C-alpha cells in the first residue's frame, strides 16, 4: 500500500496544483468519487464540477471543467480544461457570466447551435459561483 497520495491538477496552461493530499473527491461524469491512498487504478472522465481535497486536515476546493482523471495507488492526475482555486474565483464576474448566458439562451431555441455553447457557459458559471461560495 502506498505511503502517500500525490494529487496533480493540470490544465493546458499550467500545473494548477501538485502536492501530497490525504484524499481527493473528483466530479466524474457518472457522479463524484473519492480517492484515498492505496486506491485501485482507474481512468475516468471528469465533468464540470467541484474538485476537493484535504491537506493537513484542511479542505481545499477547485472549480474544474471537463477532462480526465487517472488514479493509481500513489497518485491522482487530473487533466482538465480549466481549474480555479476557490479563493481566486471572481464571484461577481461569474455571476455576470451566468446572467449573460441566461439572457442569450432565452433568445434562442434549443435546436440552435449556439444554445449548447451557452448551456456549457452557464454550467461553468454556476459551478464557479458555487465553488467560490465554499470559502
Curated annotation (Swiss-Prot):
Residue ranges of the TM segments: none
Pfam family of the protein (one): ATP-synt_DE_N
SUPFAM superfamilies: Epsilon subunit of F1F0-ATP synthase C-terminal domain, Epsilon subunit of F1F0-ATP synthase N-terminal domain
Localization (cell): Cell inner membrane
GO cellular component: plasma membrane; proton-transporting ATP synthase complex
Annotated family: Belongs to the ATPase epsilon chain family.
Function in brief: Produces ATP from ADP in the presence of a proton gradient across the membrane.
Annotated protein name in UniProt: ATP synthase epsilon chain
Species the sequence originates in: Syntrophus aciditrophicus (strain SB)
Gene name per UniProt: atpC
